[in-house]
Amino acid sequence: IWIKLNAKGLKIRQLDRRWAAEMVNDFRDNLLKFLRLNSDEPFQSAEFLNSGSYFEKVKIRSADEFDMMLKLRVSPRLMTEALDNGLFYHIRLARMPLPVNPIRAFVLDEHMLSSSKILSEMYCLVRNDFLWVVNRKRPRSPAVTLSLYRKDTCGDELISVDLVPALEVQSWPVGVRSGPDVDNWLGKKFRQEIRSLPIFYVPKRLKGQTESWRISFSHIEKTLIRKHGNKKTCCESNITKCCRKLCYMLLKSLIEGLKLRFPKELDPLCSYHGKTVFLHTMSTRFDDAMWTPQQLTACFRDLFRAMESHARRGLLPHFFVPECNLFSPAVFPPKALAFLVSVLEEQWREGLPLLKLPAPVPPIRAMSPSEDTSPEVSTDVSATLTTFLPLFALALVFVLFLKFGLRV
């Protein structure tokens, strides 16, 4: 029961969702206007692509963080060189662009396109406006984080926006060209539709590299999570509702709680590990009948056990790049992974305490300073009154009789 109650509390209120959407849309319009007025390319002709948990409708608790991609126009003739198992790349232009081509400013030796230069240029560009505040750069992050405040005050931050410059490329690299394994889940036709979509490269730095790009499938992940049903009618009405998204939101909440409780020990852990486990689980447990709302508790337990199993085996293949292990020692240190396994086992053993709602606190009754809270004193006073009240009443009647009766 408490898992269902917790899941209800994770949903963002419709009023808050509408308010946040209006604010972010206003920000997006202002940023586009700002970029169009600048002569710096390729940002002047950039376009937005919404991504992240809010637009997947799995954001939990509050609509205070948004992710957006800023699509940059580049030459379609690009050459990619895989740096690891197909997640990170060097990108080179087939030939050196002409001096009039604005992308030339970001090209290094051997026609290599610089991820660090594009990210730095974007930082410099967005600092020139007063409608938002640019946050400090985070190590190896592909995003420029902006904070939005009320126009009439410099008080608390209202919304944080991660703005990620991204190169849109139509051709998929060889290692991922077959697409994700969704045949049993969403069908072969849907898989072909996915394969026809472009992919994106974001300026994410691989450890030991300075000019690397990471391949991003966030726009396709959004499609998979929104069109999650084995049948097209899934979640179209209350009759065909499923509990997939609620299970994912519960897992996000658990990961968030673990990160807050053990920030140092679980530093490598992030929400994307949870998303990857969720995508794999939806692909294997594809039948809609396995995800009915009545089975929420059991379904979440299965999802949790899948997360625990991946951690214990030290194997979590990227959903789109299966050769890339998100739990490999190179990206997730063995000590941190062992700690993750232990805390997941502890959570399971103790009944998932991080997801339990806090016990209600009894209301506090206001009391006067002179009020005695001792039960013994209260009992004595009551007994005394019970004994002497009849005698006092009889004495009062006798006095009145003497006073008025004698006069008569």
What residue ranges belong to the model's regions?
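Helix N-terminus capping/helix-initiation residues
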Residues: 13, 114, 198, 332-333
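Catalytic cores of NTP-dependent nucleotidyl/adenyl transfer enzymes across multiple folds
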Residues: 59, 94-309, 390, 399-401
